[in-house]
Amino acid sequence: MPLVTMKLDFGDYQRPGSNISIDTKNSIQELVMDVGRDHARFVRECERAAAAGYRLLVLVESNEKYNDPAQLERWVSDVCKRCRMCSTPRESGRRCRRGSRPMHGQTLVKILATLEKKYGVRFEFTSKKNCAKRICEVLGIEY
């Protein structure tokens, strides 16, 4: 199959004739940025994919254990790991020195579930080593 490089309205990879589009994220932190600070832009991308009849798969390069929502709820931002001032979601009144609190795993799970329900977006976590293989599997291309 020939490789064609072109701008896509949503996602990073598509196969002609398929209704699946794959958007890759190089870490959970990038995913958090997209569904947090850049939420409006990310939702527009999801809406464009749904309107065009595509199923969007967001493939996050991270530990595969995070495919389990219970494990993802325990995820802690690297920012929180370095900052003693960050509070857990249940505590109140304490803020990170930057004035805003980084996203926690519980919040991330809720946002991803909402996006899956509203727009049919699927989120999958895979190791960096297996990412290319997974892209080929989903698109039906020999690896």
Task: Tell where the protein language model's regions lie, with residue ranges.
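Non-catalytic C-terminal interaction segments of nucleic acid-processing enzymes
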Residues: 1-17, 30-143
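Conserved catalytic cores of phosphodiester-cleaving nucleases, focusing on short active-site segments
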Residues: 20-26
